[in-house]
């Protein structure tokens, strides 16, 4: 009798133990641009080697132990903000393998621009390679894929879905604001000034297009850009699109307002004469999903506030 009870107890214990083992030793594999990455548990020490990946981690509520070009992120991207105490591991084009190894990461996130170093990174920690920006890609869709995949890896699936739902809600809200105000008729040209004669104009194949389309706005610039989604043109290239509203994305070059005010060509542009020049705060055009939400809100607020005849 005792022997039988002990055997039953032992068998039950073994079954309980075995049922717990998959949770402790479960290994999942994800495919990426240079192969696959296998993880036995959600990573806790993650390093991001580009700003789109940094942004995605922060949106998921994960603070990376290290990022590339930390100070540059604070200047050009800013939001979502980097918490204090994150290590800098060098530049985005040439990160320090030594600095990365010292942080003992259990996951490194990078893109195909770092392909020559991928094998070296893999020796340090499992490495996930995904490129939001490359020839033929659709940036918002790739950024969404990265967010969802990282959410899966890090056991943050619900956070990833919440982020995407929030973005869609924001886009719908801003679209209704513009529609109710009757501000969706004229096309919009999104530009960054490089100097007083040249701009970076954002094309239909870029990240910003997702915001324009969702807001019900036409892109005034009909031409495809490079795989980053822009073209560099002279101001004269805007002239053939007289119906457009020009939205200038900060920052601008010093003294630009005064220079343009004295430029016969600039003051001749129809959008200038109609006082349909708008200027918004910086939005990082080469990020992940978050810049789409930020651009949609800033752009809507600016169009509702009204334009002027010059940049600030």
Model-inferred region functions:
Residues 21-27:
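Sec/Tat signal peptide C-region and signal peptidase I cleavage site
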Residues 32-34, 89-97, 225-235:
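Short helix-initiation/N-cap motifs at beta->coil->alpha
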Residues 8-21:
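Bacterial N-terminal signal peptides
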Residues 45, 51-99:
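A short, structured surface patch at a secondary-structure boundary
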């Amino acid at each position: 009798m005792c022997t039988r009870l002990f055997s039953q107890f032992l068998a039950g214990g073994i079954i309980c133990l075995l049922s717990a083992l998959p949770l402790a030793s479960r290994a999942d594999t994800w495919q990426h641009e240079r192969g696959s990455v296998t993880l036995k548990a959600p990573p806790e020490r993650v390093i991001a080697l580009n700003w789109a990946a940094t942004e995605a981690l922060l949106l998921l509520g994960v603070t990376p132990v290290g990022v590339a070009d930390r100070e540059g992120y604070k200047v050009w991207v800013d939001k979502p903000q980097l918490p204090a105490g994150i290590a800098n591991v060098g530049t985005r084009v040439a990160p320090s393998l030594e600095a990365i190894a010292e942080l003992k990461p259990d996951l490194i996130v990078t893109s195909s621009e770092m392909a020559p170093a991928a094998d070296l990174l893999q020796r340090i920690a499992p490495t996930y390679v995904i490129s939001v920006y490359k020839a033929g890609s659709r940036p918002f869709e790739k950024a969404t894929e990265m967010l969802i995949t990282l959410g899966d890896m890090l056991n943050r699936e619900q956070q990833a879905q919440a982020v995407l739902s929030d973005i869609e809600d924001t886009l719908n809200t801003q679209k209704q604001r513009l529609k109710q105000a009757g501000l969706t008729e004229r096309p919009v040209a999104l530009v960054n000034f490089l100097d007083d004669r040249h701009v970076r104009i954002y094309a239909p194949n870029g990240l910003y297009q997702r915001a324009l389309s969702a807001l019900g706005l036409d892109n005034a610039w009909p031409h495809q850009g490079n795989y980053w989604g822009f073209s560099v043109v002279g101001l004269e290239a805007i002239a053939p699109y007289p119906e457009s509203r020009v939205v200038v994305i900060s920052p601008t070059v010093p003294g630009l307002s005064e220079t343009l005010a004295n430029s016969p060509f600039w003051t001749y542009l129809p959008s200038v004469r109609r006082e349909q020049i708008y200027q918004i705060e910086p939005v990082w055009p080469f990020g992940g999903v978050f810049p789409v939400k930020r651009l949609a809100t800033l752009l809507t607020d600016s169009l509702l506030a009204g334009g002027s005849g010059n940049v600030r």
